[in-house]
Amino acid sequence: MRFHHFWPPNDIYFGVGAAGIIEEVSLITNDRNYLFVNLNRYSLLNALNFFTRMSDINKIIVIISSSRLMPLARFWLTECKNVIAVFDAATSVQDIIRNVSQHQSGEKILTEQRDYRFRINRKDIVKMKYFLSESGMEELQDRFMNSSSTMYRWRKELAVKFGVREPRYLLLPDSVTLL
């Protein structure tokens, strides 16, 4: 896989913004080895696969996440050594530049910590992949060897962690998915 400075590669506007941030940061730190990841409802399915194959990437990763997917971004911040920071999409460009340019090698950038009632874990990521990939309940029952009631409970628990009715609502605009 070849990456320049932003992901997903088809998000041109995000790429232009990421290039501007990298340009400003490089003037301060002389480092251009950054990869900015845009985590939102459009990139969610691909991001689940991207972060499982991330060991090939030798770049410093900064995630810009929508508010709804912030628990997932925080999970990747703690689990992936390449990920150094997570910013909400509403964070100003100047704040991102300031925080990234002050980054010390080997440290994570801690931004405002909104307290999330639920933490995402590895099992949730696996479940999310299956629930969002349009797998039917019977297929999921066979794969996980569990009853339908267990599958429905898992789906409900995952939805509650993200504040939606069903996991598939994570792929819809925020105004449609409110509880």
UniProtKB/Swiss-Prot annotation:
Organism: Salmonella typhi
Domain of life from the UniProt record: Bacteria
InterPro entries per UniProt: TviA
Gene that produces this protein: tviA
Gene Ontology BP terms: capsule polysaccharide biosynthetic process; regulation of DNA-templated transcription
Functional pathway: Glycan metabolism; Vi-antigen biosynthesis; Capsule biogenesis; capsule polysaccharide biosynthesis
Protein name as catalogued: Vi polysaccharide biosynthesis protein TviA
